[in-house]
């Protein structure tokens, strides 16, 4: 993982207006390597916009983003090595759980041996081993969210895993358990 520095970033979805409205007012923040952070605020305050700026899905109107003191503001999303887990699970429903987890590695032409080792390791960590051969569409919402998280963890070159309200679709009884799992995963992968 990486140290991430947000240096005076801001974002307006209508920057060319005479009086632009900012979804994200200028601010600075540093996320230290290996730490967990929670971004709290009311709906519409810019939390998702900020995460999308860090991942490269959205370009800031002003400011710089640094990963380990390297300016990545102009880098494309795929060059930033960020994994993002969204509010609703993003999975390939026609693929098996194994193939969902393997997808990021296969796209980067990793060998079958490395794919097998990483997928099995992450599946073990996320308690998905017994589901590897099942179609992803047959899993529960919380298991699908674990697949989304697993696709981020399967790559060893990920600078950070950003989660945008990842527990929204999770059954209330399972939220506590998943929070504990996320804490353990952070300790393991930092």
What would you call each of these model-derived segments?
Residues 63-71:
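Conserved ABC transporter NBD signature motif
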Residues 153-154, 161:
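ABC ATPase C-loop
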Residues 71, 106, 113-131, 181-188:
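Conserved ABC ATPase "signature" region
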Residues 149:
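Hydrophobic anchor residue at the start of the ABC signature
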Residues 74, 135-139, 143-145:
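Conserved ABC ATPase signature
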Residues 40-42:
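The feature captures the beta-strand-to-loop junction immediately N-terminal to the Walker
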Residues 95-104, 135:
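Short coil-to-helix segment of the ABC ATPase nucleotide-binding domain corresponding to the Q-loop/switch region
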Residues 55:
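Helix-to-loop junction immediately C-terminal to a conserved catalytic motif
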């Amino acid at each position: 993982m990486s140290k991430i520095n947000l240096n005076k970033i801001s974002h307006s979805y209508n920057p060319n207006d005479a009086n632009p409205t900012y979804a994200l007012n200028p601010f600075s923040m540093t996320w230290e390597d290996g730490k967990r952070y929670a971004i709290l605020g009311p709906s519409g305050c810019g939390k998702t916009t900020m995460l999308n700026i860090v991942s490269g899905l959205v370009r800031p109107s002003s400011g710089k983003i640094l990963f380990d003191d390297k300016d990545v503001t102009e880098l494309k999303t795929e060059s930033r090595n960020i994994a993002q887990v969204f509010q609703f699970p993003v999975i390939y429903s026609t693929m098996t759980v194994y193939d969902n987890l393997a997808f990021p590695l296969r796209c980067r032409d990793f060998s079958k041996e490395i794919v097998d080792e990483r997928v099995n390791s992450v599946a073990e960590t996320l308690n998905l081993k017994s589901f590897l051969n099942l179609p992803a569409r047959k899993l529960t919402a919380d298991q699908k969210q674990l697949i989304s998280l697993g696709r981020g963890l399967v790559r060893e070159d990920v600078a950070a895993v950003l989660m945008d309200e990842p527990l929204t679709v999770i059954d209330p009884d399972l939220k506590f358990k998943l929070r504990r799992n996320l804490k353990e995963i952070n300790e393991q992968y930092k």
